[in-house]
UniProtKB/Swiss-Prot annotation:
It comes from the Bacteria. It comes from Vibrio alginolyticus. It is a multi-pass membrane protein. It is found in: Cell membrane. The chain crosses the membrane at residues 5-25, 63-83, 97-117, 149-169. GO terms for cellular component: plasma membrane. Keywords: Cell membrane, Membrane, Transmembrane, Transmembrane helix. This is Uncharacterized protein in proC 3'region.
């Protein structure tokens, strides 16, 4: 059962990251004509399209997509418990709380990976990659304020490193507040 749980958890996590990327692309007003953005939109549109007709947006927040990401996180735990318990599960409010925690952790994990890929691409492609352009649009609102406080030293931008440290601190802080379950999400 561990192999099945791993596979299902990974598939859920990957799709949750794609849905969170869609939310982030909209919030950052990133280039939607970019090939990477088009992939994200096409991968989520079959579900998000009908949901957006039912659930309206609130300001810049696409509530339908946020709700869908949350439901996916809750559903992930329900399915994993079903597998672990051989098909019997009683729904609990704990699933709702775990879903929220999982969504928060997935967003932080996605930020980490986007920052890491952006840093690597900045050394390799030097601005010629369409993915790098979108990742720059996504992360620049977080890097720019840090860059005002800590300017580049010798041409080396430390804002991404500061964000990495901040993300790790937040991760360990959540582990201290919530307990060991945070690291198992």
């Amino acid at each position: 059962m561990n192999s099945m749980s791993f596979l299902i958890s990974t598939l859920f996590d990957l799709y949750i990251m794609v849905v969170i990327l869609r939310i982030w692309l909209q919030a950052a007003r990133a280039d939607f004509y970019n090939p990477f953005s088009q992939f994200i939109v096409k991968a989520t549109q079959p579900v998000i399209g009908p949901l957006r007709r039912i659930i309206p947006s609130v300001g810049n927040i696409d509530l339908a997509t946020v709700l869908f990401a949350y439901v996916l996180c809750v559903l992930k735990f329900v399915v994993l418990i079903l597998i672990a318990s051989n098909g019997s599960v009683s729904f609990s409010a704990d699933f709702l709380f775990l879903g929220l925690l999982s969504l928060i952790k997935a967003a932080g994990g996605l930020l980490f990976w986007v920052l890491l890929i952006r840093a690597i691409l900045s050394w390799v492609s030097q601005g010629r990659s369409p993915i790098e352009y979108v990742f720059h649009q996504l992360t620049e609102p977080m890097c720019a304020p840090i860059r005002r406080i800590i300017p580049a030293i010798g041409g080396l931008d430390l804002s991404v490193l500061v964000l990495f440290i901040g993300l790790q601190f937040a991760n360990f802080l959540m582990g201290d507040i919530i307990g060991p379950i945070w690291f198992q999400l």
